[in-house]
Structure formats: C-alpha cells, structure tokens
Amino acid sequence: MVVTTSARGGGGDRTPSRRRGCGLAPAGAAALLAGASCLCYGRSLQGEFVHDDVWAIVNNPDVRPGAPLRWGIFTNDFWGKGMAENTSHKSYRPLCVLTFKLNIFLTGMNPFYFHAVNIILHCLVTLVLMYTCDKTVFKNRGLAFVTALLFAVHPIHTEAVAGIVGRADVLACLLFLLAFLSYNRSLDQGCVGGSFPSTVSPFFLLLSLFLGTCAMLVKETGITVFGVCLVYDLFSLSNKQDKSSNGALCPRSPQQPGSPQPSSLPGHPHRENGKQQRFPHKGAWGGCHSPLPPEPKSSGFPVSPRAVWSMMRFLTYSYLLAFNVWLLLAPVTLCYDWQVGSIPLVETIWDMRNLATIFLAVVMALLSLHCLAAFKRLEHKEVLVGLLFLVFPFIPASNLFFRVGFVVAERVLYMPSMGYCILFVHGLSKLCTWLNRCGATTLIVSTVLLLLLFSWKTVKQNEIWLSRESLFRSGVQTLPHNAKVHYNYANFLKDQGRNKEAIYHYRTALKLYPRHASALNNLGTLTRDTAEAKMYYQRALQLHPQHNRALFNLGNLLKSQEKKEEAITLLKDSIKYGPEFADAYSSLASLLAEQERFKEAEEIYQTGIKNCPDSSDLHNNYGVFLVDTGLPEKAVAHYQQAIKLSPSHHVAMVNLGRLYRSLGENSMAEEWYKRALQVAHKAEILSPLGALYYNTGRYEEALQIYQEAAALQPSQRELRLALAQVLAVMGQTKEAEKMTNHIVSEETGCLECYRLLSAIYSKQENHDKALDAIDKALQLKPKDPKVISELFFTKGNQLREQNLLDKAFESYRVAVQLNPDQAQAWMNMGGIQHIKGKYVSARAYYERALQLVPDSKLLKENLAKLDRLEKRLQEVREKDQT
C-alpha cells in the first residue's frame, strides 16, 4: 500500500503531496495489478456457460459453431434477433458479438478461453485506469496504483468479469478509457486563455473518435465518451492560467499539479437479461412488489392514484441510487438477478429508506459545491473527476430519465466504480494528510485489510459463477424473497430431472409473485394429474393470454385427450404469438399428419423452417415426416441440415442411419449409428445398431452391442428380449431361455416373450413346450389381427412338426382368415393337402400363395412337383382305362 502523505502545518487545508516517486517502478506496479486480477478471477477459468451466456453465445444463431460470418451481426441485437423485431432486446453490440465469434473460431466452444479473454481484458482495464489516474487525476503513481488495485479486486466486478456476457462492459470500458486518453493527447495543454483548448494532434483526435465509436459498438453506452470529452473541454475552458509567486500569469505545463484534471466518463452499460422473455415484468419496475394500481372507479380521492404511483416510483428509483452506492461501499450481498421483489417499493415518504436517499443527495450536493469552490482555487480536481466518473456512467441506468430493463444490475457498476475508487483513494490520501503518523498508519493497515477482504469476497463470488447450479442456488440463498431466482433455480432443477425440488421452487415463486405466468406453465409440465396441469395452463393464459408456451402445452394436453380441433386452434395461436417457437410447428404438423392432412402439415413445416431456420429439431422432425410420406431422399437433406446446425444431434444421426438402412445402404447406416455413439453412448443408439448387425448375420457383433445396451438400461424389456433372441440364434438356447423366463416372471403379459420361448423350444425340438408357449400368447388376446395371425401360423408350424396335420391345417386356415396376405400359411396349407393327396385343393392353395409372392422358387418347385404327380396319375388312369 503506497499512500503519499504530507505533514500537517499552518495555513489550513492542504492537498496531498504530488511527488511522482513512490518507490514502485511502473513495470512492477503493472505486474502486481495483473497478478492481483488473475488471482481474484483465475477460479472463473473453470466455469461453464451460465445464465445469459447461454442465450448470448450457445443459443445465438450469429455466434454458435457452424454459423457463417454474415452481415446479420450488424443488423441483429446481442441475442441474435433482428433489431426491427418486436421481441428484440434492442441491445446493439456487434463488435462484442464478433469477439465471441473470434473466440469460437480460434478455440471452439470451450468456455475456458472465453473466461481467459475476460480476465485479460480486466487486467488491461486495470492497467489503463492506473495510467489515466497517474497522468490526468492524481499525477501521483502511488495513488494511481492504489486506485487501480482497489478497482482490480472489487467484488462488484465479478458479474462483469466471471460472466462471459460481461465482456461487453469490460471491453467497452477499455475502449472508453483509451478514447478519452487519445482525446486528452490531442489537446493543447498549454496556456489558451479563455478559449477552448486547441487541437494539436488531429491523428489522436481521429483515433479518439474511432475508439469511441468502437466502444459504442461494443456496448451502446460507450457513446457517452463523446459527452465526457465535451465536459472535459468545458472545464478546460477556464483556469488554464495559474498565478505565479509574483502574481504574473504564465503558461502551465501539463505536468503541473494545478492543471485541470481531465475526467474520464465511462458510458453506462445497459444490462441485458437473456431470460427476460421467459419472465414477464414491466421494465425496471419489474423488480418491485406491487403492480400498477388500477384506475379509480370514482373521483372521491383527494389525491390521484396516478400521482401517488408517480411519487412511489420517484421515491423508489431515488432510493435505488443510494442502494447502488451502498453496493460499491459494502458489497456484502451480491446476486446475479435483483428483479421481482428483491427490493420492495418505497411506498410513502415515511419509509426509513428515504433517509438513505436524502443522505446521498446531501453528500452529493456538498461534494459538488466543494468541487466548484475548489475548482476556482485550482484544488481538489480528484473530487471533480471522481464524481464525473461515478455519476455520468450511471445516469442511463438510474431510471430517472427513461426506463431500462432492470432494477439493480451489478455489471453496470463496472465503469462507475472507477469514480468510486478515485474518490475513495483521494479521501484516504486526505485523511492521511490530516492524521498524525500513528493515525495514518492505522488507516493504511485498515485499507490493506479492506483490500484483502474485497479480494476474498471476489474469489468466493467467482466460485458462485462456476456453474448454473451454483449460480442459481446462490440466488435462492442470497435473496429468498426474490421470485425470479426461485423460478430460475426451478428451471435448472427441472432440466436435471429433480422434479420434486423444482415443483417446490415454482410454488415458492408463485407465493412471492402470484402473477408469474411462466411458473404456472412450467408447474403444469411437471404435474402428472392432467386436470391439475390443465388448470395451471389455463391460469397462466388468464394472466398472459399470449403466452405461447402455455398455449403450446395446453394444445398438446388436449391433443392427448383426443380433442384435436381445440388442440389445433391452440397450437396455431402458439405459433401466432411465438413465430420463432419451433416446437409449436412440429407439434401442429404432427397432429395434422395424424389426421392425414398432409398438405397442411407440409405447409406448417415449410413455414416453421422459414421462421426458424436454425432449429435442428424442426429439420429432424420434418425429415421424419418426409420418410413417413414416402420421400426418403428429400428427408436425407433435412437430417443432414439438423446435424449441421447441431453437430451433437444424435437423434437426427440415428434417424439418418435408419433411413439408410431402409434404403439398403447398410454401410452408411452403420457409419451414422457409430457417429451418434461418439456423441452419446446411449441404449437407444446401440439398439438399432445391434438390429443392423443381427439382420445382416453379424451375430457376434450384435451380441456385443446388445450386451452393452442392456448394461446401460437393465430394466428395459425390449433390449433384454433382443439379447435373448441373439443368444438363441447363436445356439445359446439355455441362456436365452433363462433370460426370457426371467422377463416373463417380471411381466406375465409379455407377448413377445412367449413367441421367443416358442422359437427357443422349437430350436430345442421341444415342440410340446413350444406349443404351450404359443397357447399362452394367444390367451393374452392381442388386438392386432396380424399378430393373432402370426401366432396361429406359428402354432400350425408346431403342430405340423408333431405330424398333427389336420390341426396344423386348421391353424393355418385361421391365420389366413385373419390375414389373407399370409403367403406362407397358404403355401403350408397347400403342402398339407399335397401330402394328403388332395392335389386339386393343394394347387389352389399354391396358386393363391404364388399370387402373393410371384417370385417364390419354392412355390414354383412345389407346383412343378404337383404337375408331375398329376401327370403320372393321369398316365396311370389312362393305362387302367386301356
């Protein structure tokens, strides 16, 4: 800790000494600052994409991998939506988006490198701030170093640095400072009398304009650097001359302590919240408890409710100024989201919190008056610059002049905190001047302890930002009365399958904010009782009639209840109010396809792909539709597009594999199945690959695949049944029998188990048991006539093996009655009649079978045998007649 002090003496108020030397070389100071920044934020390198990062990077069509570099970046907002769209956040930050794109181009979607860039930028801002304070504020390297050190470790910066989307604030701040320094460099710092400072370096002036424009394109509030430069000019207009000891006026060197202090006014960042569209609130007022009161039904009130509401809003917003200052002074309670009940409304002038507002107003007024008085005496420019740095960047976020989409946002304090740090260090320096040596030492030790405490708090805050779970859980712990944090944590728990916990937090959110339509909607999705779920969806729609997800969920619920026309209406409304909601297109098109309204379904899919071109699920579902409607070649392109949009879309890969399998391209099918397994080693991917191996006679590979699948999902009956079937084909009938009987013991109504047991017993030549298994299957009374036909056909085969030809014939006859296309049964009936010497009926059965399978060689051979027999019989008859 290096603080310059001067001895007390007569003559009243003294300023701190302006000595340049502080015992610390610039390189050493820079190294210490960079080291402190890295130590505080190094933990964030292990973090993942959390909160707004998901919407700004992972789900942003302008940023995510595979998305081409297009001009849309300069026409879309920070989240990838067109600036002209009603749903756009109107946050225009194309250069920040380009840095995300560059990150992905160089290092992929690894969050480590995103966090590394943020830390590097924070280090650079800290170093440039030290340089700015050294050259234009304190003109004292020691004080500049302490200011930058306080800035480097302040916990309020955690959201801006540890949260990847905070790069907009950090990078804009860096460009802001560089633009201001360039502008300062372009001015004539010499004596200019009563005129504006003249420009001596057009290059630095143009550079300042360029850097300021870049700051604006990184984050909108970067434009305020131009206003800062104008204010700097205004304060540079007067007092450019200093009185010498003999009263003469002389030009003042830029390095003189009394020179006017340029003020760097970083632009105020506009907080973005990627989840705002999933949570209804009215701008900044959304963080307060009370909704807008209704208009009075009578005019008997002495004071208009509108006037009362305006007063409440003014008092609350004024208090929020004091609250933000308190976060800078004592960053004890920090949270990623301060909306929906975090800060109750200041409803009356008697609210004790108004004292904080009044105190802040008095302090700011006194400081301003002090600045004006000191400015005329060419003293205490640090206070002036500190106030400008603190106040100007925060004006856009104050809600006093226009509304912004948040109540309190920690990352918007990144730039204003520079002013706080300057004022803090200046005050520390003044106190050291006034105190004796013992008091000054105590103050310095206390400041060191404060810096250590801030550093510890910053490290702990970084741990909170490591994952979605830790971030959302911390919100619930920090602000348990905030409905939004309960809602966000419930969403995370829902995604993790922890439904009971999710339901609890959704209900807590509703207790705190009963008008939370999205919480009602999500609660409905977790409710098993359809009547209760329907009630939640309807309540959500009462609160928000255009809630497209509630319309979607209610439509799907009615679809499951066979109320298809009502479902279609709701799904169409969901699309109407959420034209970029891809799931609604898929659900509506699927419902229309079920009703064989294929043309309408096709139109819905086409419209959906037009409005949601980046939806991989929509392309995949359209591919399924095309396969079902007999257009497999066209489906290939959409499956491939789904995979292109989402390289980890294993469902599309499996569907593409199945399609190639149906087209007979087994090698391509196998390739896509294996690619899907590289993405996700799941049983539902192993199963079709095992079926491919089984159906192509590669039984050893099929056995291995099914064993892996059964190990992943040992409770899934179909996988164990398929494994038993492979074992039976490979001759391991005992093991297959044991496995199948075990499944039957768990589920006595397993029809396929009895069919497989029949095949196993038949392979063991135990036809009695095989016949018994088929009879048990028939006792289950399956509803599908084709399945019953197959069972009677199998029963006929077992009876035929036992030489019970009449009973076998009867079973075959029942089989063809249920399924006249059962060619094998017709042929077997012909064979029985053939054996029994009933050649005429045998021929009739053979010919019926041949109509179904005209290329059957076996049938043709049997008919040829029958022809020869009939010819011999004819010859015998002719001989007998002669």
UniProtKB/Swiss-Prot annotation:
Q: Which family does it belong to?
A: Belongs to the TMTC family.
List, alphabetically, the Pfam families matched.
TMTC_DUF1736, TPR_12, TPR_16, TPR_19, TPR_2
Give an example GO molecular function.
Answer: mannosyltransferase activity
Q: Where would one find coiled-coil regions in this protein?
A: none
SUPFAM superfamilies for this protein: TPR-like
What keywords is this UniProt entry annotated with? Answer: Endoplasmic reticulum, Glycoprotein, Membrane, Repeat, TPR repeat, Transferase, Transmembrane, Transmembrane helix
Q: How does it sit in the membrane?
A: Multi-pass membrane protein
- Cite the ranges annotated as topological domain Cytoplasmic: 1-20, 132-137, 182-197, 239-313, 376-381, 425-438
What is the gene name? Answer: TMTC1
Give the reactions, separated by semicolons, that this protein catalyses: a di-trans,poly-cis-dolichyl beta-D-mannosyl phosphate + L-seryl-[protein] = 3-O-(alpha-D-mannosyl)-L-seryl-[protein] + a di-trans,poly-cis-dolichyl phosphate + H(+); a di-trans,poly-cis-dolichyl beta-D-mannosyl phosphate + L-threonyl-[protein] = 3-O-(alpha-D-mannosyl)-L-threonyl-[protein] + a di-trans,poly-cis-dolichyl phosphate + H(+)
User: Looking at the record, which segments are called Disordered?
Assistant: 1-20, 246-277
Assembly and partners are described as: May interact with FAM168B.
This protein's pathway reads:
Protein modification; protein glycosylation
EC number of this enzyme: 2.4.1.109
Instruction: Kindly list every residue the record annotates as glycosylated.
Output: 86
Annotated Low complexity bias: 251-267
Gene Ontology biological process terms from the UniProt entry? protein O-linked mannosylation; RNA processing
- EC category name: transferase
What is the protein named?
Protein O-mannosyl-transferase TMTC1
Which spans are transmembrane here? Answer: 21-41, 111-131, 138-157, 161-181, 198-218, 222-238, 314-334, 355-375, 382-402, 404-424, 439-459
The superkingdom of the source organism is Eukaryota
PANTHER family per UniProt: PROTEIN O-MANNOSYL-TRANSFERASE TMTC1 (PTHR44809:SF1), PTHR44809
Q: What is its main location?
A: membrane
Instruction: Map the TPR repeats onto residue numbers.
Output: 483-516, 517-547, 548-581, 582-615, 616-649, 650-682, 683-716, 751-784, 789-822, 823-856
Question: Which Gene3D superfamilies does the protein's record reference?
Answer: Tetratricopeptide repeat domain
